[in-house]
Amino acid sequence: KNFTMFTEKEQSGYHNLCRITHLEIINFAIKNPDKKVIIKPKWGGKWIDYIYNLAHKENIDLESIKNLVINEKLNSFDLIENSSVVIAFNSTTILEAAIKNKVVIIPNFAEAEEKSLKGFVMLRKFFNLFEIAESSKDLYEKINLGCKNPGKHKKFLQKRISVYERYISPIKGNQIEKCIGILKKQIQYNTFK
């Protein structure tokens, strides 16, 4: 199984958290050549450039790390399905991976613990359902442990599903059909002139 890092929103105030998290994941890939490590930014372009520039500043040649993939075009749902560990911050990916019973690591250090930004960290009241990395060292250790014990959160699955349903959508039933039905009803009441 893989482990995947989803780089979600470009957080204006979480620069050190972002930098440290990416470097620690790259470091994990370097030290664990037998593990496939995937970083999936939400967007390409400057987001990919950011990761390459970050590595370059640390004298790391990303192209030489054969087990590391950085690609924004990969299918998120396939990545979650095929990963044992998922790292995300302020993203629905946290809950999407949680209901698949994955080890979900939320980096929660640097600016995420500063008084001015602490209140903007999503799902904080549900942190007990996830692995919370409180430092770069803790992040590395949690990735390592997650790869060794990918099913450790089974006891939280029902609670994770409840949180998913609260913030995303009910799991039961065909959500696509429900959305189409809602849109059809809405369309009949709206006219374009």
Please annotate each region the language model reported:
Residues 81-91:
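Acidic donor-binding loop of glycosyltransferase active sites
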Residues 39-41, 88, 106-108:
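Short beta-strand/turn micro-motifs composed of small residues
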Residues 55-60, 92-168:
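Catalytic binding pocket for nucleotide-activated donors in carbohydrate/polymer assembly enzymes
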Residues 3-9, 35, 43, 131, ...:
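C-terminal amphipathic helix plus adjacent low-complexity
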